[in-house]
């Protein structure tokens, strides 16, 4: 458990890797999470290698002023508790490097110039408007140089 919100894209990557490496030892897991940029609670559960998670309309959304937290429970055998805890903590939403209006290069198969339109949009660190004829919008799933870079 930790206070604050997480980056759901980091969680998805971590869970995929965890299940690939240790899925046979994980019997069940479940949790309720605060995802940065979303008002709904993210509820998930899994059995062995089967993972299911979604933003829930059945559970009340985070109320204004409510302390946001992330809770995760694993049941299994021979689990590395410290590695599980660290992996979960590594999914915490990071402080972002860019602000609305900043010019960046966004990776859309190749790095292309764009402008940050919104921070923490639909659970993604950035929504970027690509500076081309279409002015298409893309989400940046993780704030690192693999996905988005400074123009400077």
Predicted regions and their residues:
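P-loop NTP-binding site
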Residues: 1-99
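Basic/aromatic-rich interaction segments and small domains that mediate binding to polyanionic partners
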Residues: 100-151
